A protein has these predicted regions:
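Short, conserved beta-strand element in jelly-roll/cupin
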Residues: 12-28, 67-69
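Short hydrophobic/aromatic patch on the recognition helix
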Residues: 193-194, 198, 243-244, 248
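Conserved hydrophobic/aromatic pocket- or pore-lining residues that grip, position, or stack substrates
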Residues: 130, 170, 194
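Aromatic- and Gly/Pro-rich donor/ligand-binding loops
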Residues: 2-4, 23
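Alpha-helical bundle regulatory/interaction domains
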Residues: 28-158, 163, 180, 185-191, ...
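Terminal helix-turn-helix DNA-binding modules in bacterial transcription factors
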Residues: 164-182, 199-241, 261-270
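Aromatic (often tryptophan-rich) hydrophobic motifs at membrane interfaces
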Residues: 189, 193-194, 208-211
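A short beta-loop-beta micro-motif enriched in histidine and acidic residues
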Residues: 4-18, 60-62
């Protein structure tokens, strides 16, 4: 499980309302000490905790937005730009009293999030434009464009360890294939429990997750190496080149050779 860390020295002693919005991928949320749930695209986590110094992203990919409101400063002085939109200190404080909450964005909320995300990614907007877009998003979220949802399947630290160690075992060498029975036996649990833990962390069944990982590896090798299709098939976990070609075509819409030709051409043009 990939982990991203960064210094957060400014956030140690203050009182915050933290809004985390998942745009793509998955992000781990510690719902309570030792209990974890996972954000997926279009979900929001609201908490009274200060920003963390690191986050875990199952699958190694995550895109999202984190908005942090300093409630101590807002209690001393609430800007008119916020109160004009109905964001009083009392309204914000009410959200912190609910603890760690998961919510699902409505279509309007998703549109506001996508707008701010696009502005941040493109990097052409002024700080004032970004502030306005962030304020608009906060107003939508607190104004009703995020609906509280059940947190779904939560897992313990030990259950998370089983899922992440199994993922590492399966992805370290894609040429090796493991059955659910082999994996569950290795960790001393039932097959149904293993599947539950893995899906809770990675958001999809083992078979789908590994198929996507194999195709990612194949695409990388096709675009960056001169290895033969047969060699790439083996490196991706397929003993038979024909089965590999069929699986690759189902995934990408083109044959391995066509994918290599198209991506080599794109690389040369760049």
């Amino acid at each position: 499980m990939d982990k991203l860390s960064y210094p957060m020295t400014l956030f140690n002693e203050n009182d915050y309302l933290l809004l985390n919005i998942c745009h793509a991928g998955r992000c781990e949320v510690e719902l309570s000490p030792g209990t974890y749930v996972y954000m997926s695209p279009g979900t929001l986590n609201v908490s009274a905790s200060p920003p963390k110094s690191s986050y875990c992203y199952p699958g190694g990919h995550y895109e999202g937005i984190e908005l942090c409101l300093d409630l101590r400063r807002l209690k001393r002085h609430m800007p008119e730009a916020l109160t004009d939109y109905g964001l009083t200190f009392e309204v914000l404080r009410r959200y912190t009293e609910e603890g760690n909450v998961m919510a699902s964005l409505t279509n309007a909320g998703i549109q506001e999030e996508e707008k701010l995300f696009r502005m941040l990614r493109e990097g052409h907007s002024s700080v004032y434009e970004l502030r306005f877009a962030a304020l608009s998003l906060i107003c939508h979220l607190i104004g009703g464009d995020a609906q509280k949802i059940d947190c779904g399947v939560s897992i313990t630290k030990g259950q998370r360890r089983i899922a992440t160690e199994a993922e590492q075992l399966m992805t370290n060498d894609l040429r090796e294939r493991y059955t659910i029975e082999e994996l569950s036996s290795h960790f001393g649990i039932s097959a149904s429990a293993f599947k539950k833990y893995f899906t809770a962390v990675y958001g999809k069944p083992v078979s789908q997750y590994m198929r996507e990982k194999r195709m990612e590896k194949a695409k990388e090798l096709l675009a960056t190496t001169d290895e033969s299709i047969g060699e790439i098939a083996l490196a991706s976990g397929y003993e038979h080149q024909g089965k590999f070609g069929s699986a690759f075509r189902d995934c990408s819409g083109v044959s391995p050779l066509e994918y290599r030709r198209l991506n080599r051409k794109t690389s040369e043009e760049l």
